[in-house]
Amino acid sequence: VVLDPACGSGMQLFSYCARLGRPGLGIELDSDAALLAAANGKRVWDADGGDWGAKTQVVFGDGTDAAAVLAEAGLPERPIAVLHVDPARPQDAQRHSLDEMQPPLSELVGSWADHLAEGPVGPAIIIDLSPRLSDAQREEVGDILGARWQDSPITWEWVSKGQGRIDRLTVWFGGAADAHSPARMLRLLTDGSVVRFAGESITATTDISSTPQPGQWLTIVDSALLSSGLQQQWLRKAISHRSPSRWLRTDGRRPLLLTDIPLRMDDPKVSSFVSTTGEIMSQAKLPPNEAGIESILVSARSAYLARLTLRCSLSPGLQPILQQALDKGLKIHPRGKQGFLIDADTPDGPGWFICRAP
């Protein structure tokens, strides 16, 4: 049986049931939601045509009271092949403890542990978590699961639709995990295809030992990739392993990579994780403010840019003023290339770089 102890509408549960061909057990504390879930289960079963639906149940009750639920459902002692849960959680997950999820994770695992069928690597557990979970909270989740099943594998999965946002964070544990891939990154593309990286998660480190020079390339990389720690696998696709590269920034919304050569942007595995990339034309002599905008315009015109997009940290009030001034000042090169202005730390302090897109 596939168990979801907080099934809500039941759609995720029934999706797993249809995919695995196994009956499901959904538990819902809200009676109206339980009725909706039961109706959804019937609809999915009718569309799928499998035989799993005949033994699928939705129980109105407390998902942390395993014994009572199993008794009501008339199921044996260890009937659960897969436990999946997407607990309700506070919006600002980093400011709350894991036990503020509903149902609380530690209580849930403790209640169901003795009722999970265990294979060679432990039970199969899938937990959807807040995409904003901190590293410390992820470690806490691992500790909760590992306390009961010390040697079971664990796979953390990040899912992103782009724009530097993590759309889903899931932990796959025990029989549900990929024993060879502690981390997995899925990038969902608009055409329905998926770009996938998997392997060991490695924390990226910054290197601002020297100032970026004209002719080098700056690339803003999707922050979701660095959250997964799989940026080295991506980098091996992006440039030759013989070509040097270093991270100028690894946190925030604009992780910044410096390379000596352009990236292989014709490869979807590379381009799908790139926000913008360009060749450094010059370093701005003055910072982007109302006093320095004319100097930046001179450099942009010298690079024959038709547009220079601000990709640096600016106050919300100043950004549109400066962007309007740049747009107006670059009308003389309507057939020029696109460019961007990006900030980066250097050994001499903050720097701003004018880059031209390929």
Language-model segment annotations:
Residues 1-358:
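SAM-dependent transferase fold signal centered on methyltransferase-like domains
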